[in-house]
Amino acid sequence: MDKSKRLFTKSKRSFRRRLPPIQSGDRIDYRNMSLISRFISEQGKILSRRVNRLTLKQQRLITIAIKQARILSSLPFLNNEKQFERSESTTKTTGLRTRNK
């Protein structure tokens, strides 16, 4: 092959199938916190189906389980750890008063 044709050939990489995030033995339940916490972002949002690589039925069951866990307060609605860190760092003391900036 000459150089002009060699530029357009694709390299053949091996395709490795990813493992499904939910195994067949896993029960999707609001009490299974180790399973549910894998599908929640750092901000406490439910991750999309495309990010999770779940089927439609699995995503629906995960969403229902997360909402049940939030209502029963075993899972927070929001994850406010970053907001607390930011508010503590912006507090300034001026004389006897403390001000939040």
UniProtKB/Swiss-Prot annotation:
Keywords: Chloroplast, Plastid, Ribonucleoprotein, Ribosomal protein, RNA-binding, rRNA-binding
Localization of this protein: Plastid, Chloroplast
InterPro entries linked: Ribosomal_bS18, Ribosomal_bS18_CS, Ribosomal_bS18_sf
Pfam family, one: Ribosomal_S18
Domain of life of the organism encoding this protein: Eukaryota
Main location: plastid
Keyword rRNA processing (UniProt): no
GO MF term set: small ribosomal subunit rRNA binding; structural constituent of ribosome
GO biological process: translation
One GO cellular component term: chloroplast
Family as reported in the entry's similarity comment: Belongs to the bacterial ribosomal protein bS18 family.
Self-association state and partner proteins as the record states: Part of the 30S ribosomal subunit.
Name of this chain's protein: Small ribosomal subunit protein bS18c
Organism this protein belongs to: Carica papaya (Papaya)
Gene that this sequence comes from: rps18
